[in-house]
Curated annotation (Swiss-Prot):
Binding residues annotated for Zn(2+) 1, in chain numbering: C13, C16, C31, C34
Protein name stated in the entry: Reverse gyrase 2
Catalytic residues of the enzyme: Y943
Organism field: Aeropyrum pernix (strain ATCC 700893 / DSM 11879 / JCM 9820 / NBRC 100138 / K1)
Keyword Aminoacyl-tRNA synthetase: no
Binding site for ATP: Q89, A106, P107, T108, G109, V110, G111, K112, S113
Domain Topo IA-type catalytic, chain residue ranges per copy: 799-1200
Length: 1215
């Protein structure tokens, strides 16, 4: 390409596996060697034909053949069903025709059953394969068989126990003889008649509709695997491996000896080898599971993961168009009867499990007595549901059980309009048993501690410290119950729980009875109204799943519905609302606020197909971090999960409330950058070549060593650091992304909204573009459901100017870094040494300050006062120190005071955050950024790499909501703190402080994908207080400056004596109350005098360096911490343990002196700043990349030439 920087991606041509230019990938074309004369418009068909004509068709032939197979199936589907594949169906069809085994996770109404029915007939009739179709009930056997008979008459053989005797015998004979091509039966048939199927049948396709019915008998998992072609030896090997991994997991987290752990690791390695060998000889059929919801128990379901690469579980139906309301009444049964009677036809009543089946019978009787026809569905019988479906019963009544027949198995959109919950859905456990959960124990101990219970505070502190060292708290829970023996911290924690639980039960019961018998703690309720105290946990997933029966996709519209919770206790309703607040956008409101006339009209019209049409899209959402992927996946219920190689792909569904679009998401991560400049001997300038006025930069996929963790971009099969051949290559991620891209309608790349994130996004775009042209860039600055939905909605593209600037930045860093590092390694004969464009000026600041510190060393005399305060005085005079050590009091010579109104500081930018994290919490820059990254990716704070103080309207609203909840609305003063723009300051994304966050996590109201440590809480607290304070009125400060005399020495001490109102109520400055009590002539007794070595010039901390980097313009939010950490990694700088001061090592001083003398032009602050400014101009499009690179190469060349001319010859060692 003329001018600019053209990236060449080594080994990423999708047809031949050779090198390919980025402009080719951007157009969806293979490399120039494969296709010298490309077609005008690149489509799979035109590219395939051109490659075939050129005689260079390679790996792309498989993709084309897959496309053709999908087209053949689509034609069959259209002919047999009378309609074309919907978006979601097409996505699944692509996976089906490739032979993938997987679980379908999707909302009701998108065509799963229709697709699978037609596909089953297609495999049996067209592919001549054998098919097994399993469903949970006999009623469904009849329905599926009838549909199959319409698609391919006579192709299916159905069996269920209530068939006419002659038909039943005929089916059994056909199955037993081996003559059945497509068998439809219940999962019960699999258990009872397995001997008819195995070993004579090896199914090419097995479909399981509703995995829970399969898993009720864990042996069925093995049976279905055997029927799809796995040998008994393979299944047994997989089962043994699963059990061995669980044993190792428990051993590691229960303090088992090293010999036990080592033995288990060896056993696992042997089992893995055995399983790999078995799988290499296997040719299994295809297993597809639909409606894979729920939480499988036991370990057998993990065989699907080991053998087929997917996991069952997940998929709560969070797509709803429902008004959520509640009523509190002392007679909930009577009030429920009134409400149901008034609603009329199409009501489903869900009775809470804590109330029991007798209450379900009671409400049915009450309604029948009022003349309302009901159907009571307390078992799996089909008749009540059929009566409701036919309109013979106006009301259907059942239990609010996650796996209940009317919660999971009901799909009657035209009939189901209203959901009424008699009692908030919940489950109850004996309180003592519940407290064996470490998290719940901590949640309740924190409440007791807050109320001044000393023993609870001590137990909380001890247990918290121990649990910090325990990865899996379930080990502690089992040990506390006496079901497992645990050692170390886990065992100690279990002991504390066992001792504390009975005492805590007594305290909670007493507290609950003071409040009428019910005590709500966040999303939990202690019920002490009876002789046995219980912990009641609201079941938000069941509420969402059950209420979803009255709202689903139907006739292209999401039907409208109404859900009403009726309970006698407001605590239960509030606890359910608390749980819903964190997991969904649902908010319970009083029924009296609902406009029933309008809502009834909307409910009826939506069932006639009126209303906003819903478009269903399949979307691949790509992020860079596995943590961020997990956070997003859990926003809309328990996600499905599949594994391809080392990648995890989560599956979930989400509805956009503004557009009505439904996205069936596949969410995965790149695990960081995919490519970087190669270190191979390619190009004349360290992986870069001049190219007709521009440059060609050679990028290679990134390899990571599995033994030492080192990363490299060479083509060597061995790690350059330790020589190990065990490494993973990001090329495998590229291949997985390409596979996923070919399965979906669109790809949204939602990597971080900064330069690094843009480069990752560009690499992903180029990787998938040949497989799917519908690629968009999604950006969000907070990981929240709202932000993700907005990103899915946006139609942005990758910013080319940012990419161009990032390429230039990387090349500049490579040129300067490689030149300097090469000199250092040869000069000092130490191969690990290195230097960099920003790293070296930072080292210079640290070295210079250290020298200043040494030159001004002295003594800090600290006086500990009887008034409770402290003051200090610095001197370099040793005799003065000795005199001051004998001082018994300080005399107040003079007092000066003033009162000032002080505005709050703005919310944090990255540099200010790092400064305070270092100063207040003693964190290194690297650890501070790691903690902030965790909080961001877990959906707790906004993006942490920012130089903006701007607060969005959403942020302002959040602060006002929090202040109102604390009765501080009168202290609010909203501020935007900056002009409009994409970036925001660092702030929380929820109106909850650190204490409430910790309780919500401990009680299970909030689920986050990381272990929330005390350090996470402290950092969150610091960010939260700073942000809330920024939205408050100024505080009034009384400032006192006292002139004090100690013996012959006179010195001053100034500080804040009092603070009143405003932001100080949330984020107070340091207050020294003893100053307010001083008057001239007072004597203050000195309790103790401490003398420590000090200096007039304090050593820098990480926060000081970050501030200087911003002030001098030599860094960006994404590089602040990295520059310091690189100096530490090379051994140039250490950090003092207590005060976190940065101290240069002897090597660091030598390196800096050598570079600053020999390569001053390359490592000076001025040069680094000018380069940063030039890169900013490239980013803005006002300077050409090639001009900057040419200038930098000349500068490097001149510096090297000048260095050589001064007499220092490369290769001459200091030795």
């Amino acid at each position: 390409m003329p001018g600019g920087v053209n990236a060449v991606y080594m080994g990423l041509c999708y047809n031949c596996g050779g090198n390919i230019d980025e402009d080719r990938l951007e157009k969806g074309l293979p490399c120039a060697r494969c296709l010298p004369s490309p077609p005008r418009r690149a489509t799979p068909l035109t590219v395939y034909r051109a490659l075939k004509k050129a005689g260079t068709l390679g790996a792309y032939s498989w993709e084309y053949l897959s496309i053709r197979e999908v087209e053949r199936f689509e034609a069959y589907f259209a002919a047999k069903s009378g309609s074309r594949l919907w978006s979601a169906q097409r996505s699944w069809a692509k996976r089906l025709v490739k032979g993938d085994s997987f679980a379908i996770i999707a909302p009701t109404g998108v065509g799963k059953s229709t697709l699978l029915t037609v596909y089953a007939a297609y495999v049996a009739a067209v592919k001549r394969g054998r098919v097994l179709y399993l469903v949970p009930t006999e009623n469904l056997v009849r329905q599926v068989y009838a549909k199959l008979d319409q698609v391919e008459p006579g192709i299916a053989t159905a069996y269920y126990s209530r068939m006419p005797a002659k038909a039943r015998e005929s089916s059994l004979e056909k199955i037993a003889s081996g003559g059945a091509r497509l068998i439809v039966a219940t999962t019960g048939f699999l258990s009872r008649r397995f001997d008819l199927l195995h070993p004579q049948y090896k199914f090419d396709l097995a479909i399981v509709d509703d995995v829970d019915s399969l898993l009720r008998n864990s042996r069925n998992v093995e049976r279905i695997l055997l029927l799809t072609g796995f040998s008994e030896e393979t299944v047994e090997a997989a089962h043994s491996l699963v059990k061995a991994r669980l044993k190792l997991y428990r051993a590691l987290h229960s303090g088992a000896s090293e010999s036990i752990v080592s033995r288990l690791e060896q056993e696992i390695a042997q089992l893995e080898a055995r399983l790999r060998l078995s799988l290499s000889e296997a040719s299994p059929g295809q297993l597809v599971i639909a409606s894979a919801t729920g939480r499988p128990r036991g370990v057998k379901h993990l065989l699907f993961k080991e053998l087929l690469g997917f996991e069952v579980g997940g998929g709560s139906d969070y797509l709803r168009n429902i008004v959520d309301a509640y009523v509190v009444d002392s007679d909930p049964v009577g009030r429920t009867a009134e409400i149901v009677s008034a609603l009329g036809d199409g009501v489903i009543v869900f009775v809470s499990q804590r109330l029991g089946k007798d209450v379900a019978r009671a409400i049915a009787g009450r309604l029948e007595g009022m003349g309302v026809s009901t159907a009571l569905a307390l078992t799996g019988a089909r008749r009540p549901v059929e009566a409701f479906a036919r309109g013979e019963a106006r009301v259907l009544i059942g239990m609010a059980s996650r796996y209940g027949v009317i919660v999971r198995g009901l799909d009657l959109p035209e009939r189901s309009k209203y959901a009424v919950f008699l009692g908030a859905p919940s489950a109850k456990t004996h309180l003592l048993e519940a407290l064996y959960s470490p998290r719940r124990m901590l949640a309740f101990l924190s409440i007791a501690q807050e109320k001044g219970v000393e023993w609870a505070g001590e137990a909380f502190r001890r247990l918290s410290r121990l649990l910090e060292k325990v990865i899996d708290t379930s080990i502690v829970s089992l040990a506390a119950r006496g079901k497992l023996e645990a050692q170390g911290p886990a065992g100690e924690a279990a002991g504390i729980i066992s001792e504390t639980a009975p005492r805590l039960v007594d305290w909670l019961v007493a507290e609950a009875r003071l409040q009428g018998g019910l005590l709500r703690v966040g999303g939990l309720v202690v019920d002490a109204r009876g002789p046995i105290p219980y912990l009641v946990v609201p079941d938000a997933p069941t509420y969402i799943q059950a209420s979803g029966r009255v709202s689903r996709l139907y006739r292209g519209v999401m039907t409208r519905g109404l859900s009403i919770v009726v309970d006698e206790a407001p605590e239960y309703v509030e606890a359910l609302g608390e749980r819903l607040k964190w997991t969904t956008s649902s908010r319970l409101r009083p029924l009296s606020e609902v406009d029933m006339e309008k809502l009834r009209r909307e409910i009826e019209e939506s069932r006639r197909g009126k209303g906003r049409r819903v478009r269903v899209k399949t979307t691949l959402l790509v992020v860079e971090s596995p943590t961020k992927a997990r956070t997003i996946a859990w926003f809309w219920g328990r996600p499905g999960k599949r594994r391809i190689g080392r990648s995890v792909i989560y599956e979930a569904s989400v509805s956009d409330p503004e557009t009505g679009d439904v996205h069936i998401l596949q969410i995965t991560s790149t695990r960081g950058h995919l490519t970087d400049l190669t270190t191979d001997s390619v190009g004349s300038k360290y992986g870069v070549d001049e190219d007709g006025g521009g440059y060609r930069a050679y990028y290679s996929t990134i390899k990571r060593c599995l033994d030492c963790g080192a990363q490299h971009t060479s083509s060597s099969p061995f790690c350059p650091r330790c020589g190990s051949p065990r490494q993973v290559d990001s090329k495998s991620v590229v291949e997985i992304l390409r596979k996923l891209a070919s399965e979906v309608d669109e790809i949204v790349i939602a990597t971080d909204p900064d330069r690094e994130g843009e480069k990752i996004a560009w690499d992903v775009f180029l990787a998938v573009r040949p497989y799917n042209p519908n690629v968009r860039r999604g950006r969000f600055h907070e990981v929240t459901p709202r932000a993700v939905i907005e990103a899915l909605r946006s139609g942005e593209s990758v910013e080319k100017s940012l990419i161009e600037a990032q390429k230039v930045r990387r090349i500049v860093d490579r040129w300067i870094g490689f030149h300097l590092s090469t000199h250092l390694k040869l000069k000092f004969s130490k191969p690990w040494l290195g230097a960099g464009r920003v790293q070296t000026p930072v080292l210079g600041w640290i070295v210079d300050r250290y020298r200043e510190w040494q030159d001004t060393r002295g003594y800090l005399v600290i006086f500990k006062l009887s008034s409770g305060g402290r003051t200090s005085y610095f001197t370099q005079n040793r005799l003065e120190v000795e005199n001051l050590k004998r001082v018994e009091w300080l005399e107040v010579v003079d007092i000066a005071g003033k009162t000032e109104e002080r505005n709050p500081p703005p919310p944090y930018t990255t540099d200010e955050y790092l400064y305070d994290a270092s100063r207040k919490l003693g964190l290194s820059a690297g650890l501070a950024m790691k903690i902030a990254q965790d909080l961001f990716e877990s959906g707790l704070i906004t993006y942490h790499r920012t130089d903006s103080t701007r607060v969005s309207p959403t942020g302002v609203k959040l602060a006002l909501e929090y202040l109102a909840s604390r009765g501080l609305e009168g202290e609010a003063q909203p501020r935007g703190w900056g002009e409009g723009g994409a970036h925001e300051a660092i702030r929380p994304v929820r109106p909850i402080d650190a204490q409430d966050l910790e309780r919500a996590v401990l009680s299970g109201s909030i689920r986050i994908p990381i272990r929330l440590t005390r350090l996470h809480i402290r950092v969150y607290d610091m960010i939260f207080r700073r942000f809330i304070a920024s939205q408050m009125k100024p505080a009034t400060l009384d400032i006192v400056e006292a002139t004090l005399q100690a013996g012959e020495t006179v010195f001053n001490h100034a500080g804040v004596a009092r603070v009143r109102g405003g932001y100080a109520l949330v984020n107070p400055p340091r207050v020294e109350e003893w100053l307010a009590r001083l008057s001239p002539g007072d004597r203050i007794d000195v309790e103790d005098v401490l003398v420590v070595k000090s200096s007039l010039k304090r050593l820098y901390r990480a926060g000081d360096i970050v501030k200087m980097m911003r002030e001098h313009g030599i860094g960006r939010p994404s590089t602040y911490a990295k520059a310091i950490e690189q100096n530490r990694r090379h051994g140039y700088v250490i950090e003092s343990k207590k005060m976190r001061y940065l101290i240069p090592t002897k090597t660091g001083v030598s390196i800096y002196d050598y570079l600053s003398n020999g390569f001053k032009k390359l490592v000076s602050v001025d040069t680094t700043r000018r380069l940063e400014e030039a890169l900013e101009r490239v980013e803005k499009g006002v300077e050409k990349p090639e001009a900057v690179l040419a200038s930098v190469w000349r500068m490097v060349d001149e510096a090297v030439s000048l260095h050589a001319a001064t007499g220092d010859v490369m290769g001459q060692s200091e030795a």
